[in-house]
Amino acid sequence: LTKIGNAYRRFHGMVSDRPTNFSWVTEGKLAGSGLPVTQDEFKWVLDKGIKSIVTVREVPLPSQWFDGGDIDYMHLMVEDYGAPTMEVLDEAVNYIDKKIGSCKAVLVHCAAGKGRTGAVLAAYMIKKENLTAEQAIEKIRLMRPGSVQSITQETALSMYEKYLKIKKQ
């Protein structure tokens, strides 16, 4: 599946100037998408006002794309259909919150912009909107169909909800 998806994203990058599955979760502040595979797609993202990018996949974006720019960047090494640890999820959510608080719009992406992207966006909702994991998954799936693709990701979000409750005590 990944090879087919990668081929699709490369083809999409040749005929479109935007990454697959781009949408705002919070207009002008927080977005999700698939992997920007060309520099034109990367530029399109920046033209939308994105000032910070969180990559949630095995390989980071090309470092030369950031040369001379004022873009903040975080790479979370997470395998396809996997989920970050509780600590890494919390670090990502805090990073996103800090950037949004500094008026820097954030893009979260993985390869397809669904599973890992959806998990990080749902984790943000759990912490910042005080939602349960179930509510956050339902909300992100309504906004971005196909989000949170695996039991591993669903379980990680349930554990993250519990992790946050324990941290508050």
PLM segments and residue spans:
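Conserved G/P- and acidic residue-centered "switch" motifs that form tight phosphate/ATP-binding loops
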Residues: G113
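Cys-dependent protein tyrosine phosphatase-like superfamily
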Residues: L1-L107, V120-Q169
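Ser/Thr-glycine-rich phosphate-binding loops at phosphate-binding pockets of nucleotides
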Residues: T117
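Short cysteine clusters
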Residues: C110
